[in-house]
Structures are given as structure tokens and as C-alpha cells.
């Protein structure tokens, strides 16, 4: 059941996940304009970082137009009400980077690991709590493990000090039943004081629906982005999600019209590749592939004269996870030397 008295914590990710859609090339002026619009529209937090988190700017993931600290400082100087969040992947970002991000203005951190690797988040979660940050555990590619196993990992993050645990559908591969099962499993083991969050991707066009189902099962925080700006087919489109929950009578604290205008007038014109469900982004959701693989895969397909869809299907068959972007070229080279075996149906295993 929905609690119409409870306010949804609206977490915008346009300036972090949305980085993937522009190959991490937001200008500082872009960041300022987007942040101001979001702040005025009433979101609770604005996540700011390279698409792959603090220190993600690299040959493997793509170099950013600016440093994380430059983006964070500009946004922190712009907003008047919203909190500044950032993302950290252990092994890419360090506690030193987290300390600097906090000093630059970030008061919320989401510590992200693969859904079966919560163990590697302990140092970073504990350090974030020492800094006094709102500390979130972020279990990526949550479709790749069972609800019960995911709950075990969530409990680990809680034991390290995380105040909120996210179900993260990085591949946009889950449906409403998958989401319900995972939130029920988390609620069964987490302390009632520990919040939960939902990070959806729209590769199967279920980003908004999955976010609403998460709310039905007690979710506290919802990630979304203007126009869905994000990896793959994007995240749950913020303006659509808020319009939908507004019609349901749920409390969100946002100005629907301001979000719609910001999406159309500020963010959509920045899309160099339309953020939408199409052949390649649908392949991500169908095959359960990490959404940020999209642009890297399209580049490899162009370079080697291959079909991006088939590369993505093969990546799904091999169960590649976030951080294995370097394997995209390996897969492409393998496909050049032999005809892919199996069918698309071989990719899916529920």
C-alpha cells in the first residue's frame, strides 16, 4: 500500500548518470543551469560527478570535460536548498577523493558496488559516516542476484553504517515483480530505521513503473533525471515520475511544471544521442547489460564494422558487469574472428 502521508525523497541524477549521455562533457555552465532549475523545482538532492563516480575520468571510462571537484563546487555555489550528492565506486574513487568532495560541498555519498560485492564498501562507508555525510549503499546490477542474496549484501552495508540501501537496476532489466521481490527481501532484514532507495533505468520502458512499485513496497528515495538523462535509455524520467505520483496524490515537494520546462528547454537540447528506447538501448535491458556500456559498444561497432546490438547481446551472454568496459573491445575482436554462436534467447536466464 502507498503511504500518502509520507514524502518521497527525490534524488536527481541528471548531473551524474546523465554524464554518460554526453560522454561526461557537461560544461560548468551546463551544470549550473541544470542545478539551478532542479533546486528551484524542489528536488531533495542533486548528484554530481563523472558518470562513473569520483575519479571516473579515465581512458577506460572516458575523460570528463572537468574534474569532479569543479562540477561539485559550481553546483554547490548555485543551489540554495537541495543537498549535493556524489557517487563513489571503491577501486575507482578513494577516501581521499571523498574527503575532497565533501569539502567541495557534497553532503551525501552513494557508495556503489556490484550487487554481490558489498564487502569492498566497508572502508568507504565507515569513512563517510566519520565525515558526517548522509551515507548510502548502492547495489549495482541488482538483477544479477536473487532477492535473498541481495538482502544479505544490503545487511552488510547497513552494518558498516549505511543509512539507506539502494536497489539499483543498472541494466534496466527488471520488471515490477522483480522490484517488489527485492524490496520485500530488503525490508525483511534491514532495521526499520534504515531507508531504502530505487535507481531505475528505462531500457525496457519500465523506469517509472518500477519506481512506483518500489514506493508501494516501502521505498523512501527515488532516483530520476530530467528527460531520463542517463546511461542507456536513461533513468526514470524525473518530470514523468513526478507527474505520475502527483496524479496518485503522493507527496513529492516538487513543481511539476518547472521540471517539465527544465527537461524540454535545458536538458533535451544537450542530448547528442537521443536518450530513448531504441534497438541498442533495448538490447541492454533485454540482455541485462550495464547501461553505461552503450556508448563504448557503439564506438567499437563503428570501429570494427560490427552490429552494436549483437555485441551487447554477447556481453549479456558473458554476464559482463560494470567496470569491465575494456572487455567490449575483446568481445568485438572475438566476433570478428568467428560467427557468434547461440541465439538471443540464450542470453536471458531468469
Swiss-Prot record:
EC number(s) reported in the record: 4.1.3.39
Pathway: Aromatic compound metabolism; p-cumate degradation; acetaldehyde and pyruvate from p-cumate: step 7/7
InterPro entries on file: 2-IPM_HCS-like, 4OH_2_O-val_aldolase, Aldolase_TIM, DmpG_comm, DRE_TIM_HOA, PYR_CT
Enzyme category, top tier: lyase
One GO BP: catabolic process
Binding site for substrate: 16-17, 170, 199, 290
Record protein name field: 4-hydroxy-2-oxovalerate aldolase 2
Organism from which the protein derives: Pseudomonas putida (strain ATCC 700007 / DSM 6899 / JCM 31910 / BCRC 17059 / LMG 24140 / F1)
Amino acid at each position: 500500500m502507498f503511504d500518502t502521508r509520507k514524502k518521497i525523497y527525490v534524488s536527481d541524477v541528471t548531473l551524474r548518470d546523465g554524464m554518460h549521455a554526453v560522454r561526461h562533457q557537461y560544461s560548468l555552465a551546463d551544470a549550473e543551469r541544470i542545478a539551478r532549475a532542479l533546486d528551484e523545482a524542489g528536488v531533495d538532492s542533486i548528484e554530481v560527478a563523472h558518470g562513473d563516480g569520483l575519479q571516473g575520468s579515465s581512458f577506460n571510462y572516458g575523460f570528463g570535460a572537468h574534474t569532479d571537484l569543479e562540477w561539485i563546487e559550481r553546483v554547490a555555489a548555485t543551489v540554495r536548498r537541495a543537498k549535493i550528492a556524489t557517487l563513489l565506486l571503491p577501486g575507482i574513487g578513494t577516501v581521499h577523493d571523498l574527503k575532497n568532495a565533501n569539502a567541495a560541498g557534497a553532503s551525501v555519498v552513494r557508495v556503489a558496488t556490484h550487487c554481490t560485492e558489498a564487502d569492498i564498501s566497508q572502508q568507504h562507508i565507515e569513512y563517510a559516516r566519520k565525515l558526517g555525510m548522509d551515507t548510502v549503499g548502492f547495489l549495482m546490477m541488482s538483477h544479477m542476484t536473487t532477492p535473498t542474496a541481495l538482502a544479505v549484501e544490503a545487511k552488510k552495508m547497513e552494518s558498516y553504517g549505511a543509512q539507506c540501501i539502494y536497489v539499483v537496476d543498472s541494466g534496466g532489466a527488471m520488471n515490477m515483480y522483480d522490484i517488489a521481490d527485492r524490496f520485500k527481501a530488503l525490508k525483511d532484514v534491514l532495521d526499520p530505521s534504515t531507508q531504502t532507495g530505487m535507481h531505475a533505468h528505462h531500457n525496457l520502458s519500465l523506469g517509472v513503473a518500477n519506481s512506483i512499485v518500489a514506493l508501494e513496497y516501502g521505498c523512501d528515495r527515488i532516483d530520476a533525471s530530467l528527460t531520463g538523462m542517463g546511461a542507456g535509455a536513461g533513468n526514470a524520467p524525473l518530470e514523468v515520475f513526478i507527474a505520475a505520483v502527483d496524479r496518485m496524490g503522493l507527496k513529492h515537494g516538487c513543481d511539476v511544471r518547472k521540471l517539465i520546462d527544465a527537461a524540454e528547454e535545458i536538458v533535451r537540447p544537450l542530448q547528442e544521442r537521443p536518450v530513448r528506447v531504441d534497438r541498442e538501448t533495448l538490447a541492454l535491458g533485454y540482455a541485462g547489460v550495464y547501461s553505461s556500456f552503450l556508448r563504448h559498444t557503439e564506438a567499437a561497432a563503428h570501429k570494427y564494422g560490427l552490429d552494436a546490438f549483437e555485441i551487447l547481446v554477447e556481453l549479456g551472454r558473458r554476464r559482463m558487469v560494470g567496470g569491465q568496459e575494456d572487455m567490449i573491445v575483446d568481445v568485438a575482436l572475438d566476433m570478428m574472428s568467428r560467427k557468434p554462436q547461440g541465439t538471443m534467447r540464450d542470453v536471458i536466464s531468469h
